């Protein structure tokens, strides 16, 4: 695989990771809404299980955020190491 193809694939993966993180954030918001609704409803099953799920999803978002940052750094290092600025913009 050529260097530019690798860079394009890394950029695609970064977009997908960011999309996944956004999806997880949406899940967390929905969980919070269910937890709030259950305050009025008072179902013990939900009281017992939802906080654990909330914690797991929140932890997953943090892990995903770290992964995105680390992979972005990997991508940037690859870009610099392979001098791809000269290939992408020959006037540079």
Protein language model features and the residues they cover:
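Short, charge-rich amphipathic alpha-helices with coiled-coil/heptad character
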Residues: 1-9
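Short, charge/polar-rich alpha-helical segments
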Residues: 8-21
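Long amphipathic alpha-helical coiled-coil segments
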Residues: 38-42, 67-92
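Generic N-terminal initiation segments characterized by hydrophobic and/or small/turn-forming residues
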Residues: 14-17, 28, 64, 75
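Short, glycine/alanine-rich amphipathic alpha-helical segment
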Residues: 42-63
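Residue-identity detector for glutamine
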Residues: 5-6, 24, 33, 72-73, ...
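Amphipathic alpha-helical interaction modules
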Residues: 18-40, 49
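Amphipathic alpha-helical coiled-coil segments
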Residues: 24, 56-74
């Amino acid at each position: 695989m050529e260097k530019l193809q690798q860079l394009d694939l890394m950029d695609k993966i970064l977009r997908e990771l960011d999309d996944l993180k956004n999806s997880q954030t949406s899940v967390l918001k929905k969980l919070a809404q269910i937890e709030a609704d259950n305050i009025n409803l008072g179902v013990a099953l939900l009281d017992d299980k939802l906080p654990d799920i909330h914690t797991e999803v929140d932890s997953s978002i943090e892990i995903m955020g770290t992964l995105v940052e680390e992979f972005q750094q990997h991508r940037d290092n690859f870009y610099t190491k392979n001098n791809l600025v000269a290939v992408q913009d020959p006037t540079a």
